[in-house]
Swiss-Prot record:
The keyword 4Fe-4S does not apply. GO terms for biological process: adenine catabolic process. InterPro entries: Adenine_deam, Adenine_deam_C, Amidohydro-rel, Metal-dep_hydrolase_composite, Metal_Hydrolase. The keyword Hydrolase applies. It comes from the Bacteria. Pfam families: Adenine_deam_C (PF13382), Amidohydro_1 (PF01979). It catalyses: adenine + H2O + H(+) = hypoxanthine + NH4(+). SUPFAM superfamilies: Composite domain of metallo-dependent hydrolases, Metallo-dependent hydrolases. This is Adenine deaminase. It comes from Bradyrhizobium sp. (strain BTAi1 / ATCC BAA-1182). Keywords: Hydrolase, Manganese. CDD domains: AdeC. Its cofactor is Mn(2+). The gene is ade.
């Protein structure tokens, strides 16, 4: 049996004569899907009484129902029973690593949810393993039963060596080389350092040039209306951070695509309803908007895929036809691939989804092959998922912790001010809270009064002699033990929070023993652990197994009292999002891009 990958379907230029013969009825198709309503993303209508003629993994034509009868026989027929046939979903902005699984494992959940193409920014593994990590994920993607394209990581590290230690450093020359050697590298990934871009930083603009010289589009990530004009003038043409009405207005009129990000209500990515209202209240066209998932853990990916985002868009006021187009054709159009994916026109890949009236996927075809039927993966897909890429040995040895170091700071006995990191739902923006401490030696009482707990970040790439930075979280809610993660965005050093030194040490040791992971510790015991041995970011298990591990982690996370989800906790070191962060170098004041002491 041949492997099921993106390459299973021949390129269009090699099939045009065959497709023309089938479309005109001179040659029979390989199979026909009949009795369907077809969702046209081109006209944004649902067309009744249609059938699709498929050959070579591509759509030859959409015909009136029953047209195949004039051909005689010799082809398979699939009866859609008046269900809706729509093009497979296209996710224009995701990070596979957030799901903590490999590209091949990710494909299972994506196809179950009707997603057949993704545009992945692999800056997480790039921050750990540099080019070698990005290329390993590309090799993984080539073997996956899913169309995966790379938006080349543009901001590795997220800031500078003065503010944090990363494992990777993707220079302009390295980025140019990735574009030149990998056809899958179709765009530049989100340019998160929008302040340096707008200020004319030389390195940032050299990276932009590496993409623009090659005709590749540039993806973005920007906060603040004051930056929009300079950002757009620098060549950035999409962003997924536009939920405020005024900045969305500015971005649309500056020619910047807006990806409306949808996430479960319990995560930092729950912004879709507000984002949709922004577009509808502006009276703006949705033609330059698409929907995306951005980040999903393994558990949420199974339940809240891009199909869920589309349905949420309908709830927020879009028509079903508009919403599905935003989830398919628009993402394809943004990356100039609408001649291949995103619709059911002749010549397009036969990436198809059978929907019920609520836009819930029932069955999925990938390149004309049935991979999900009645909500279950087929033997063909199961076989493809078992042929997983083997990551190099170096990927299993990226957590290089120093000898035991102190994880809590020396607490002053004199009056001081604490530069605390105040957490709040959904967990993206962190507030710089200056907490005045009167002279006292009873710190446990002060911790309870002010809602404080310890936090530390430990350098794990073996580069900075085991840097450890200490901080205090406010309102994180942790009432016992410790929590730790090797997925501390974006440099992915170890972040640990706790109520006491002993449990914090146990948590960090557990991360080290598994070469990465996320864990909860109480009373000296590991209560939940998601091992992530590949680059300290990815599991080597099937997504269903990882999803079960994540469910237990979430249960124990909540039992520990944490007020923001673990994915929000992973963002605490992300030094490009306001207001205050902690990295292995110390506390970072983001607007000023400078370090500040814990106690003043």
């Amino acid at each position: 049996m041949t492997k099921l990958t993106r390459f299973s379907v021949a390129p269009l230029h090699a099939m045009t004569r065959r497709l023309a013969d089938v479309a005109s009825g001179r040659v029979a198709p390989e199979f026909v899907i009949t009795g369907a309503r077809v969702l046209s993303t081109y006209s944004e209508r649902i067309l009744p009484n249609r059938e699709l003629w498929i050959t070579g993994g591509r759509v030859a034509a959409v015909k009136p129902a029953g047209a195949h009868k004039a051909l005689g026989g010799g082809f398979a027929i699939y009866d859609a029973a008046d269900g809706i046939i729509a093009p497979g979903l296209v996710d224009p902005h995701i990070h596979i690593e957030s799901s903590m699984v490999t590209a091949c494992a990710y494909a299972e959940a994506a196809l179950l949810n009707g997603t057949t193409t993704i545009f992945c920014d692999s800056h997480e593994i790039g921050n750990v393993m540099d080019v070698a990590g990005v290329e390993a994920m590309l090799e993984d993607a080539r073997q996956a039963p899913l169309s995966i394209f790379l938006t080349v990581p543009s901001t590795v590290p997220a800031t500078s060596a003065a503010l944090e230690t990363a494992g990777g450093d993707l220079t302009p020359d390295k980025i140019a080389d990735l574009f030149d050697r990998w056809p899958e590298a179709v765009a530049l990934g989100e340019k998160m350092d929008f302040v340096p871009v707008c200020m004319g930083d030389e390195r940032s603009h050299a990276i932009l040039a590496a993409a623009l010289q090659r005709g590749r589009p540039v993806s973005g990530h920007v906060y603040g209306r004051e930056f929009v004009a300079a950002y757009a003038a620098s060549g950035v043409t999409d962003t997924h951070e536009a939920i405020d009405r005024d900045i969305a207005d500015d971005l649309l009129d500056a020619g910047v695509w807006i990806f409306l990000r949808g996430g479960p209500p319990t995560t930092p990515w729950h912004s879709l309803p507000q984002a949709i209202r922004t577009i509808t209240e502006l009276g703006a066209s949705h033609k330059r908007t698409a929907v995306c998932t951005d980040d999903r853990d393994a558990d949420d990916l199974m339940l809240f895929g891009l199909d869920w985002v589309v349905r949420e868009a309908v709830k927020a006021g879009m028509s079903p036809e508009q919403a599905w187009s935003m989830g398919s054709l628009h993402g394809a159009t943004r990356f100039a691939m609408d001649g291949e994916i995103g619709g059911l026109g002749g010549g397009r890949r036969a990436d198809l989804v059978l929907l019920d009236d609520g836009l819930k996927p029932q069955s999925t075809w990938y390149g004309g092959e049935l991979v999900v039927e009645n909500g279950k993966i087929t033997p063909r897909l199961d076989q493809a998922l078992s042929q997983r890429y083997q990551y190099p040995k170096a990927a299993y040895a990226t957590v290089k912790l120093p000898a035991q170091v102190k994880l809590t700071p020396e607490l002053p006995t004199k009056a001081c001010t604490v530069n605390a990191i105040k957490t709040a739902l959904p967990g993206i923006t962190l507030i710089h809270d200056k907490v005045a401490i009167a002279p006292a030696s009873d710190w446990p009482t002060l911790f309870a009064r002010h809602g404080l707990c310890f936090v530390a970040v430990i350098e794990r790439h073996g580069k900075s002699a085991g840097n450890v930075a200490h901080g205090l979280l406010k309102d994180f809610g942790l009432t016992r033990g410790a929590v730790a993660s090797s997925v501390g965005h974006d440099s992915h050093n170890i972040i640990v929070a706790g109520t006491n030194e002993a449990d914090m040490q146990v948590a960090v040791a557990a991360i080290g023993s598994h070469q990465g992971g996320v864990c909860v510790v109480a009373d000296g015991k590991v209560r939940a652990m998601v091992p992530l041995p590949i680059a300290g970011l990815l599991s080597d298990k099937r997504i269903t197994e990882v999803a079960e591990e994540v469910k237990l982690l979430k249960t124990e996370w909540a039992a520990a009292g944490c007020t923001i989800p673990y994915m929000g906790f992973n963002l605490i070191p992300l030094s490009v999002i306001p207001e205050i962060r902690i990295t292995d170098k110390g506390l970072v004041l983001v607007p000023q891009m400078e370090l500040t002491p814990l106690f003043e």
